[in-house]
């Protein structure tokens, strides 16, 4: 079984969401580097990332950026053909920053920041994964197929420009030419299995790889894709 893993530290981690909006989790407040990383992503996969909407998440920084730095980041991302559309909810300083930038806050990120200020509520149980959804026909370019709380099995082809998403695992018994995203609600244990692997993009729990990041020796092969230590792994099936 061949295995491929390409690890490198990034100033910003881009996670793909299930509704077509990505989250840019900023790890290092190095504006030129962040802009260059996003510009490189657009260059490698323009159909996926050009003019893509992103949410800026400053939650991993010890302090939010000042207004001048935040403006430089937003303007630089726009110049790189990436569109910041919101800021992840955070502290009062981030609230003020969002107002100054004219970007809305997303309240679903509130718990991430208030975790240490209030007692944590009991963990919510994850909805059980059902028996799964089966797709018999081709998923054509421009179509999106989502299997909520279950696995997705496709007995045909996923065309270029098509998108298949599942909260569980994804099994594709034809050719994958489009995008496949498993573990869409954040379950990092989910996997993608494919008989003929020619994907534009693959993602597990938001972590992703695009076509140019996938070794050529795996294209056209039967593979499995999984997440290990927050890194996408791809292996040919024997």
Swiss-Prot record:
InterPro entries per UniProt: CAP/MinC_C, MinC, MinC_C_sf, MinC_N, Septum_form_inhib_MinC_C
The keyword Disulfide bond appears for this protein: no
Key words of the record: Cell cycle, Cell division, Septation
Gene Ontology annotations of biological process type: cell morphogenesis; division septum assembly; regulation of cell division; regulation of cell septum assembly
Source organism superkingdom: Bacteria
Matches recorded under SUPFAM superfamilies: Cell-division inhibitor MinC, C-terminal domain (SSF63848)
Record has Kinase as a keyword: no
UniProt-listed NCBIfam families: minC (TIGR01222)
Subunit: Interacts with MinD and FtsZ.
Function noted in UniProt: Cell division inhibitor that blocks the formation of polar Z ring septums. Rapidly oscillates between the poles of the cell to destabilize FtsZ filaments that have formed before they mature into polar Z rings. Prevents FtsZ polymerization.
Family designation: Belongs to the MinC family.
Record protein name field: Probable septum site-determining protein MinC
Organism: Xylella fastidiosa (strain Temecula1 / ATCC 700964)
């Amino acid at each position: 079984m061949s295995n491929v893993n390409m690890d490198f530290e990034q100033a910003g981690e881009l996670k793909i969401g299930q509704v077509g909006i990505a989250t840019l989790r900023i790890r290092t407040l190095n504006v030129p580097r962040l802009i260059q990383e996003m510009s490189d992503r657009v260059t490698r996969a323009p159909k996926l990332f050009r003019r893509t909407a992103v949410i800026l998440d400053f939650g991993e920084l010890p302090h939010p950026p000042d207004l001048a730095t935040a403006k430089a980041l937003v303007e630089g991302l726009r110049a790189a053909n990436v569109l910041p559309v919101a800021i992840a909810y955070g502290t009062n300083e981030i609230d003020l920053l969002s107002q100054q930038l004219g970007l809305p806050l997303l309240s679903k990120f509130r718990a991430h920041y208030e975790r240490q200020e209030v007692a944590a509520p009991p963990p919510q149980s994850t909805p059980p994964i059902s028996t799964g959804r089966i797709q018999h026909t081709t998923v054509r370019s421009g179509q999106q197929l989502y299997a909520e709380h279950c696995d997705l099995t496709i007995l045909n082809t996923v065309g270029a420009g098509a998108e298949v998403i599942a909260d569980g695992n994804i099994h594709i018994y034809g050719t994958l030419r489009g995008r496949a995203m498993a573990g869409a609600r954040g379950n990092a244990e989910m996997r993608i299995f494919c008989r003929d692997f020619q994907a534009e993009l693959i993602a597990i729990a938001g972590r992703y790889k695009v076509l140019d990041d996938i070794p050529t020796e795996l294209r056209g092969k039967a593979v499995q894709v999984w997440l290990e230590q927050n890194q996408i792994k791809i292996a040919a099936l024997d």
